[in-house]
Swiss-Prot record:
This is Large ribosomal subunit protein uL14. The keyword RNA-binding applies. It comes from the Bacteria. Disulfide bonds: none annotated. One of its GO terms (cellular component) is cytosolic large ribosomal subunit. Belongs to the universal ribosomal protein uL14 family. It comes from Saccharopolyspora erythraea (strain ATCC 11635 / DSM 40517 / JCM 4748 / NBRC 13426 / NCIMB 8594 / NRRL 2338). One of its GO terms (molecular function) is structural constituent of ribosome. The keyword Translocase does not apply. Keywords: Ribonucleoprotein, Ribosomal protein, RNA-binding, rRNA-binding. GO terms for biological process: translation.
């Protein structure tokens, strides 16, 4: 459950290390975002010399969340941290590598490039 003011780790090599959620996209009064949802965020911590700067407003897709997610088959999935991948306006990831596992829900939301770059899909 990612909401406004939630801080997330960035799971790619775009240069950002931590982001803070500004808005959850997908409806006027939408409060929470889960795996596969898009958020608008600001970069809170970045690597010096990277193409993403601190204070920059970016879009990101959630790839891991601490809150357990119930799947259609009745199983639950949860991760140790909240993490996101920065995306371009076209929906492609800004980085060229993804770190850590990602949720299978990304496949249903058509983020095939993120799925193919990820080392593990759970």
């Amino acid at each position: 459950m990612i909401q406004q003011e939630s801080r997330l780790r960035v799971a790619d090599n775009s240069g950002a290390k931590e982001i803070l959620t500004i808005r959850v996209l997908g409806g006027s009064g939408r409060r929470y975002a889960g795996i596969g949802d898009i958020i608008v965020a600001t970069v809170k911590d970045a690597i010096p010399g990277a193409n993403v700067k601190k204070g920059e407003v970016v879009k990101a897709v959630i790839v891991r969340q601490k809150k357990e997610k119930r799947r259609a088959d009745g199983s639950y999935i949860r991760f140790d941290e909240n993490a996101a991948v920065l995306i371009k306006p076209s929906g492609e990831p800004r980085g060229t590598r993804i770190f850590g596992p990602v949720g299978r829900e990304l496949r249903d939301k058509k983020y095939m490039k993120i799925i193919s770059l990820a080392p593990e899909v759970l």
